[in-house]
């Protein structure tokens, strides 16, 4: 009987320790998030920000980066292969809109949604695309800001 108790305790400890080891997916996400923070991205969001996005689900992530552009208060949502202006609709009649739209279309397909705020740019994208995709996104965003 004592041997069974000892075996049970040892198996419980082994099981508990195995849960502490991160999975391959979690290791990959930690590498991507580390690179993102080095590149100037803020990862995560508030409940209020999540509600502003139309395509946010728990399977995708919200990343934010400083907005150095003159573009403020714009919201684009992916429909098919293109990012479509969601708000404000009055921007479509602005003479600068074709230039903005051309730059927005250069964003990779992994970007599901992008919102330009006064101080930052928030994007929804699938983190599992890898850090190379993140660097493409950053390059495209910097191209938009210039």
Regions found by a protein language model. Give the residues of each.
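Secondary-structure boundary elements
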Residues: 38-42, 146
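Structured extramembrane domains adjacent to transmembrane segments
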Residues: 53-133
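Short extracytoplasmic
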Residues: 41-59
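A generic alpha-helix structural signal
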Residues: 33, 101-104, 138-141
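Extracytoplasmic/periplasmic C-terminal soluble domains
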Residues: 133-146
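N-terminal signal-anchor transmembrane alpha helix of single-pass membrane proteins
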Residues: 1-38
């Amino acid at each position: 009987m004592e041997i069974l108790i000892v075996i049970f305790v040892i198996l419980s400890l082994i099981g508990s320790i195995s849960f502490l080891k991160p999975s391959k997916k979690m290791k990959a996400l930690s590498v991507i998030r580390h690179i993102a923070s080095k590149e100037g991205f803020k990862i995560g969001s508030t409940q209020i920000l999540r509600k502003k996005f139309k395509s946010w689900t728990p399977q995708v992530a919200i990343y934010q980066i400083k907005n150095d552009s003159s573009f403020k208060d714009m919201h684009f949502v992916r429909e098919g292969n293109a990012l479509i202006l969601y708000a404000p609709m009055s921007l479509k009649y602005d003479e600068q809109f074709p230039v903005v739209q051309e730059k927005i279309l250069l964003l990779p397909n992994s970007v599901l949604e992008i919102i330009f705020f006064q101080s930052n740019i928030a994007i929804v994208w699938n983190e599992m695309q890898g850090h190379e995709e993140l660097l493409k996104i950053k390059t495209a965003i910097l191209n938009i800001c210039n």
